[in-house]
Amino acid sequence: MARKSVLLDTNVLIDFLGTRQPFFEQARKLMIAARVGEFELWMSASQVTDLVYILSEGGKKRLVPEVLRRLRTLRLFMNVCPVTAVDADAMLASDWSDPEDALLARLALRLKLDAIITRDEDFPHIDGMPVMDCEDFFAWLRETEGVVYEEAVL
C-alpha cells in the first residue's frame, strides 16, 4: 500500500490546533495516524500565517507564543507546500467563490496529492481529487486500503 498524501483545509487545522468541538477528536485521530507515519499531511505556507493570525485572535501578543509552539509541534510531521507566483495567479484568475479553496485545490493538484480533507461542504468538486471530511477520509481508507483506524481503549 502506497502512503496516501492529503492536503488539509484550514478549518481542519483549526479544529485540531484550537481544540474546536465537536470536531477536535476526528482531527486529533487524523494527526495521530499521520504522526506515526500512516499517511502524509500537507498544508500551504500561506496557511501557516493564517493560522497564527486566527488562533492568536488577530495577533494578540500574549497568544502568539502558544500558537507558534503548537505549529512547531505540528511541523514535526506536517509538510508545508510553498505557494508560487503561478499558484497565486491561478487563484486570482479562478472563478471559484472562495479564493482559499481555489488555491488549495491548485496546490493539491500540483503536488499530485490523493485527497483534500475539509469540513467545508461547499468546497467545489475537483476531477480526480476526492474532497472529504476526516470521518469520510477514514471510511475511504477502509474501503480502498482495507485499513481501519479505531482508538484502542486502555
Q: Positions of the model-derived regions?
A:
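Short, conserved alpha-helical segments within structured domains
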Residues: 43-47, 100
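Acidic, PIN/NYN-like endoribonuclease modules and their adjacent C-terminal/linker elements
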Residues: 1, 5, 110-154
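Alpha-helix capping/helix-boundary segments
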Residues: 12, 47, 87, 104, ...
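Short, well-structured N-terminal submotif of metal-dependent ribonuclease cores
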Residues: 1-43, 59-63, 140-154
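Short active-site oxyanion
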Residues: 37-41, 76, 112-114
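Active-site-proximal, substrate-binding regions of enzyme catalytic domains
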Residues: 28-31, 46-93
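Active-site neighborhoods of divalent-metal-dependent phosphate/nucleic-acid chemistry enzymes
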Residues: 78-121, 148-149
